[in-house]
Amino acid sequence: MRLHVVDHPLVAHKLTTLRDQRTDSPTFRRLADELVTLLAYEATRDVRTEQVDIVTPVAPTTGVRLSHPRPLVVPILRAGLGMLDGMVRLLPTAEVGFLGMVRDEETLQASTYATRMPDDLSGRQVYVLDPMLATGGTLVAAIQELIKRGADDVTAVVLLAAPEGVEIMERDLAGTPVTVVTASVDERLNEHGYIVPGLGDAGDRMYGAAE
């Protein structure tokens, strides 16, 4: 597994406002969208391309375009849905799948309640979206599902990560073609499994609490 922390002043600026408890939901959603686009720029550095011959208004030339099969973008519901627009803004031709996963707040274990994506992901580059890499359980389970379907190149785009979650990813996904792209690796997890200093519950801050 490879970890890439994006070091950029605009990333740090937007992340600081996201962390601020005074930031309201509409502003949080907008900033998360903008931050994901910045992270997506880094996450797609190795997106697969192929040569194409074109003619400009001046002369013929050779360029590149995204190759087939098209990349697949998979947000983890529900909070990952708030990252989708920011990702497909840079990959408008990507296909989109969905994984519905929920974490038990007592055991911190993840379970899947919904899946909508191709059964065969052989040869596909997949970008999985989840705001927080906290305990690592949800993201590990999601990526294992993608690899089971044949994905050979998975990039996880997360707003924040905790060292404990990174360690779990490195342990459970050792030797797999996985990259994690994030704006920050924070200090630690607290006793409730929240990232410290973090930004709170990303889903609740995007959409309001779900009872």
Curated annotation (Swiss-Prot):
E.C. number: 2.4.2.9
Binding site for uracil: 195, 200-202
Highest taxon listed in the record's lineage: Bacteria
Residues involved in 5-phospho-alpha-D-ribose 1-diphosphate binding: 78, 103, 130-138, 201
Cofactor: Mg(2+)
Enzyme class: transferase
CDD domains, alphabetized: PRTases_typeI (cd06223)
One GO biological process term: uracil salvage
GO molecular function, one term: magnesium ion binding
Pfam families: UPRTase (PF14681)
Biological pathway: Pyrimidine metabolism; UMP biosynthesis via salvage pathway; UMP from uracil: step 1/1
Keywords: Allosteric enzyme, Glycosyltransferase, GTP-binding, Magnesium, Nucleotide-binding, Transferase
Cofactor annotation comment: Binds 1 Mg(2+) ion per subunit. The magnesium is bound as Mg-PRPP.
Regulation of this protein's activity per its record: Allosterically activated by GTP.
Keyword GTP-binding in annotation: yes
Function: Catalyzes the conversion of uracil and 5-phospho-alpha-D-ribose 1-diphosphate (PRPP) to UMP and diphosphate.
Family: Belongs to the UPRTase family.
NCBIfam families cross-referenced by the UniProt entry: PRK00129.1, upp
Name of this chain's protein: Uracil phosphoribosyltransferase
Source species taxonomy: Bacteria, Bacillati, Actinomycetota, Actinomycetes, Kitasatosporales
